[in-house]
Amino acid sequence: MTRKKRSRGVGSEGPAVFREKSTTQVDVEARKSQKDKKRKGLKSGNRNAEALDPKHYANGQKKDPRLGSKKPIPLVVEKKPTTKKERRLSAEQELDMLENDAQLMVLLDRIEAGEKLGAGLQKQVDQKLDRIEHLMGRLGLLEVEEPEVTEEAPVRKGAKTDEDLLDQFENMDLDSFGKE
C-alpha cells in the first residue's frame, strides 16, 4: 500500500480561517486560564471555619468567639424541691382493684361465653390473672391444690420381677441364636 504524501494545499475543509484578537484580549484570556489553573484545590485557611452569620456581628464588628455567655452562673447550689413519689399500693389494695376491674370482668365473661379474644386482649387477661394469683399467694389467700395420691398399680399375675427376668437371661441358650 502506497502512502500518499500530504500536501499543504487547500483541502476539502477549505482554507484555514484565523481570527485575529487584539493583544489585550489575548492577555485577559491568558490571565483567566492561569487563575483557573492555580485555583484547582480548596481554599486555604481554617478547616472548621463556619459560615458567617449576621448574629456574630455586633455594631458592625465581628463577635469574638472566645467570649462566653453573659448568663449569670449561680455560685451557691440550690436544693431542688423533691417531688413526692406515688405510693405503691399495698398488696391488698392492688388485689381489690384487680378483682373489681370492670374491663377484666367483661373479658372473662366473653371467654366463658366461648368467644375467642385477640392476642393482645388474651395477653392482657393472662397478665392480670397471673398478678392476682401472685398477690393471693403473697397474702396467703391462695389455696394450694394437693396432688392426688395415686395408688401403685397392683402387680399382675403374669408380670415378672427383676429376679425372674435375670434368671431367664442367665439360663438362655445363646448358641441357638447364631445358627440360622
Curated annotation (Swiss-Prot):
The entry's keywords: GTPase activation, Ribosome biogenesis
A GO biological-process term: ribosome biogenesis
Database matches in InterPro entries: YihI (IPR007336)
Region feature Disordered, mapped onto this chain: 1-88, 147-180
GO molecular function: GTPase activator activity
Bilayer-crossing regions: none
Residue ranges with Acidic residues bias: 164-173
Record text on subunit structure and interactions: Interacts with Der.
Protein function: A GTPase-activating protein (GAP) that modifies Der/EngA GTPase function. May play a role in ribosome biogenesis.
Protein name, entry field: Der GTPase-activating protein YihI
Gene for this chain: yihI
